[in-house]
Amino acid sequence: MLVHQGAGAAETTTMKIQIEARGKKWTISLENNETARALYAKLPLTLDMEDLYGRELCYRFREALPAREVEMRGYEIGQVVYWPPRHSFVILYRQNGEAFDMQSVGRVESGIDELAQLGDAKARLTRAE
């Protein structure tokens, strides 16, 4: 979970992204790592998300994001990851048992079943309040 400390040491907030597509909204809680911070710094963004392999929504950035904690592993439904070989921002909505090199970025808080039905879509990503 990515935490931002405000002016007072006791003031902390979890950094979150709101995704809006086809009139629906979802929230992603970010992890505390360099990749999540770099993604958050790019917001707001409008991305053409592709529905790939029957398991994920994906957008490929032109430029790489920093990713120094990449590991080969399996994933959980609702996990949000960065796949370095193709600079891919990925939301995983269905399990197929595959393991691959990934940098974990965060997690969709709720509504992953609705997100799985989205298909290819234009999505607006903003900083959640």
Protein language model annotation of sequence segments:
Residues 6-8:
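Cleavable N-terminal signal peptides
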Residues 11-60:
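N-terminal secretory signal peptides
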Residues 18, 106-129:
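Well-ordered alpha/beta subsegment
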Residues 65-69:
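Short alpha-helix capping/helix-loop boundary micro-motifs
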Residues 78-79:
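Loop/turn positions that initiate beta-strands
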Residues 84-108:
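Beta-strand-rich cores of mature extracytoplasmic or soluble domains
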